[in-house]
Amino acid sequence: MLALLLSPYGAYLGLALLVLYYLLPYLKRAHLRDIPAPGLAAFTNFWLLLQTRRGHRFVVVDNAHKKYGKLVRIAPRHTSIADDGAIQAVYGHGNGFLKSDFYDAFVSIHRGLFNTRDRAEHTRKRKTVSHTFSMKSIGQFEQYIHGNIELFVKQWNRMADTQRNPKTGFASLDALNWFNYLAFDIIGDLAFGAPFGMLDKGKDFAEMRKTPDSPPSYVQAVEVLNRRGEVSATLGCYPALKPFAKYLPDSFFRDGIQAVEDLAGIAVARVNERLRPEVMANNTRVDLLARLMEGKDSNGEKLGRAELTAEALTQLIAGSDTTSNTSCAILYWCMRTPGVIEKLHKALDEAIPQDVDVPTHAMVKDIPYLQWVIWETMRIHSTSAMGLPREIPAGNPPVTISGHTFYPGDVVSVPSYTIHRSKEIWGPDAEQFVPERWDPARLTPRQKAAFIPFSTGPRACVGRNVAEMELLVICGTVFRLFEFEMQQEGPMETREGFLRKPLGLQVGMKRRQPGSA
């Protein structure tokens, strides 16, 4: 055998084995052969991995649907279905589908609510925190959200007064940075009982510890989170690569794996601080970590330190850059669309007392135009732009979706970005920013059902109510107290990891007197 491998025929044998490695899975899934696929997507996961590595997977998949139609095979087992009629079939209650092995790449420390694939484990984990995020319960969080937004306003007022251009009156800043500081400090306050301190210091930093007993070090949390999202989404296309990722020649993977460890270290540090006896003794707040400590593991025991930290990490990830990315996108789309900010000014000035800087949730939750602006940004920007993959598990019967029959082992997804920009669903102006489309007199039942910024079904975002409250109060504050000018050319650039995130938004900002034209 060794002689054969070392002979001239060895190369041909190796090539033949390589071809069989990719060809056999293709032949095995004969029922998927009639679904068109771009490039080598039908034969190897590396095609999708490469698109994800480049940071524009959502665009490539969208273009593939424009070329091939509603069904596109984007990996040997994975079919993307650009059909709003498939949303409930793929993500709805009672279908038995599971999160695919894509989510294995996101596991750090211990499986958490986001990346667990076991249905019973997910039910147990969700039960621990779901009541904390109910509309009835989120009122307890508002004072902490409010306090951080007040500090945000204080810092912007300071910059408006001390850094303004004397000719234009505007102070220059990257709005994305400040939305990141705000979002991280809010989730730090809600989850761990204290903000990170980014707003106060005006910079991205966080303490991390490799273990609870390790000495502290400091990292840029926003940068760490970005890199972690990119590498995890990329490795999710080929989860078997994860153990070897740091040995790959592309530094993207080495840096990304380090970011995974650093982000886990941030959660370790925050949990460690929160569990200190003197902090526990003096704590009177019901924060997310307190709720998690009330939870039980699979044996009915209190959560161990590893699982508790993993769940805290889930809350940190879910509640930070999702909010900041969306806030930044809202500012961008409002600035680039004539007339929107003026309508916001009018609506906000009428609803909020003039002597109030940061409104309460009650003051802004029933302002229709503000809500329309937020929803329209979520539609056109699609912070979660990719199709979230679901696997049909063994034992499930075949299921027909969008006219095609799928079998156990197949993976399906519905691409949010493509659905949210479909002209068939949203009309000829689907790629334009039109807040008025959310007027109940205009919005169709189909459009309402096709809007899935928080996903849908049993694995939908558990923190939706808190996220919407944050966005309403943040946007109600920012647009009422400040005026803006665009200071960058061209569209706002984005890059996709697990989320579609802006790369920056350079604007001019100055104080606005509420009630002024």
From Swiss-Prot:
Catalysed reaction equations from the record: benzoate + reduced [NADPH--hemoprotein reductase] + O2 = 4-hydroxybenzoate + oxidized [NADPH--hemoprotein reductase] + H2O + H(+)
Chain ranges passing through the membrane: 4-24
Cofactor(s) of this protein: heme
Induction text: Expression is induced in the presence of caffeic acid, p-coumaric acid, p-hydroxybenzoic acid, protocatechuic acid, and benzoic acid.
Signal peptide start-end: none
Keyword tags: Glycoprotein, Heme, Iron, Membrane, Metal-binding, Monooxygenase, Oxidoreductase, Transmembrane, Transmembrane helix
InterPro entries per the UniProt record, alphabetical: Cyt_P450, Cyt_P450_CS, Cyt_P450_E_grp-I, Cyt_P450_sf, Cytochrome_P450_monoxygenase
Principal location listed in the UniProt entry: membrane
A GO CC annotation given for this chain: membrane
Subcellular location field: Membrane
PANTHER family: BENZOATE-PARA-HYDROXYLASE, CYTOCHROME P450
Protein role: Cytochrome P450 monooxygenase; part of the benzoic acid degradation pathway also known as the protocatechuic acid pathway. Benzoic acid debradation begins with the conversion of benzoic acid into 4-hydroxybenzoic acid through hydroxylation by the benzoate-4-monooxygenase bphA, and its partner NADPH-cytochrome P450 reductase cprA which act as a mediator in electron donation from NADPH. 4-Hydroxybenzoic acid is then converted into 3,4-dihydroxybenzoic acid (also called protocatechuic acid) by the p-hydroxybenzoate-m-hydroxylase phhA.
Protein name, entry field: Benzoate 4-monooxygenase bphA
Organism: Aspergillus niger
Highest classification ranks of the organism: Eukaryota, Fungi, Dikarya, Ascomycota, Pezizomycotina
